[in-house]
Regions:
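Solvent-exposed segments in extracellular or luminal domains encompassing
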Residues: 60-73, 143-155
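C-terminal edge beta-strand
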Residues: 5-11, 86-94, 167-175
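Solvent-exposed strand-loop boundary residues in beta-sheet-rich modules
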Residues: 14, 55-57, 81, 137-139, ...
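Solvent-exposed loop segments of extracellular immunoglobulin-like
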Residues: 41-55, 123-135
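Short, exposed coil/turn segments at beta-strand boundaries within extracellular/luminal domains
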Residues: 1-5, 81-87, 109, 162-168
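A short beta-strand segment in extracellular, disulfide-stabilized domains
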Residues: 30-41, 112-124
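Proline-enriched interdomain boundary motifs that mark the N-terminal boundary
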Residues: 15-22, 97-104
Length: 175
């Protein structure tokens, strides 16, 4: 039984530093990209990123640059030189639009006016909305006299929820 003892050098490659910042929330139907530079800013340079729907990184995310569903996804940062990788979660938030349902106010005879801010105009809408009143569907020209509208026409009511998402709907006024 002859034997020889030789020293063996074992080296460990460090895991890459992967920093993940959740992208800002958006309002539906907008999508979110987790491939943008800001999501992995602060990570080691030169990493290759792949995107998954599960923490074990076995189910590839089909379109990581246009995610349309809220949830937790996973980013795998790999150092292609060493083969070492780290998997980190990223949370995507896509907020729903509020429902704004308009009930046109009853016609009035001049000199009477119509108050668009009364609850009966928006009673069937989502709760907790903040309303603004507009002359146009693009919400560029505000309707300053929305509590005393004296001219017939189509105006617009925009409802915004606590997440900042909004929906705008027309309201018909007959004076």
């Amino acid at each position: 039984g002859c034997f020889t003892i030789k020293p063996v050098t074992v080296s460990f490659n460090p895991a890459p530093n992967v920093v993940v910042t959740n992208p800002p929330a958006v309002c539906s139907p907008a999508t979110v990209s987790i491939t943008s530079i800001g999501v992995t800013a602060g990570s080691d340079s030169g990493l290759t990123y792949t995107y998954f729907t599960n923490p074990g990184a076995t189910t590839v995310l089909s379109n990581p640059s246009a995610i349309a569903t809220s949830g937790t996804y996973y980013i795998k940062g790999t150092n292609t030189t060493t083969g070492c990788f780290v998997i980190k979660p990223v949370v995507v938030t896509i907020n729903a639009l509020p429902s704004v349902v308009i009930t046109n106010p009853a016609a009035v005879c001049a000199p009477a006016t119509i108050d668009l801010s009364v609850s009966s105009v928006t009673v069937s809408s989502s709760t907790g909305l903040t309303y603004t009143y507009w002359r146009d569907a693009s919400a560029t020209t505000s309707l300053s006299n929305y509590t005393a509208v004296s001219a017939s026409g189509t105006y617009y009511i925009k409802g915004t929820n606590a997440n900042g998402c909004s929906t705008i709907q027309p309201v018909s006024v007959t004076v």
